[in-house]
Amino acid sequence: MEFSFHFSDDIEKYNESRLEINDSGIKRDEFYLSLTEFIRLLGNSFAIDLNKTYKSPILPKNLIHYTYNPLTKTWELFCDIQAFLSDIKAFNDETVFIKVGIPRLLIKYIFNETREHSYQLTELFIYALKDTESINEDTQIYKFPFSNVNNVGRMCTGSNKLPKINALLEAENLHKNYLFQTVFTNHFYNERNVSSYSLDKLLSKLQEQAFPQEWLIEQNMTFGEIIK
């Protein structure tokens, strides 16, 4: 069975709207009812179970905010990553800088839930943060100080295939298992920090050294503006 509702934007034909019922291309029945009545009937068909508790899946421990769109099955996860040291490959798979100082990061992951227990990463945005205080809507956001990230914070992944995970909990370590496993190039390395170093010299300088917070450049956005 197929149900189709027809109405006109002509105010004089407002009450001439109708609901048709078709079966295999053959019209079986037709009802005339106003658009207001149709909306009321449609709204009443969505019953809310007040006794049902809706639970989120288990979430990453570094998650500070998330949104979920049930129509598109899209998840946006915002993870707060404390400053750490990481090996970084630059320009090719053979050139590796050891234990490079990475500042505190704010990473926004966007996942599409393709089916139960399957989440495809579609985009990620990376920003830097200062200090160790808790994040609030007024927290100032800074640019990711390395390369491969454009002016709005979106990471360019190039030919790297975006990962699929089986549980949102796995996003907790995606910065280690995916982001810093990619090869960094000079792409978008322009006004990313206030040092005068080229990317290779910067990575060399930061080996086994914490990233200097005073080198960060403001993104001209607050956390509250990012999550709007």
Predicted feature residues:
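Compact alpha/beta protein-protein interaction domains typified by the UBC
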Residues: 2-163
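Domain-scale recognition of soluble eukaryotic interaction modules
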Residues: 2-4, 10, 136-228
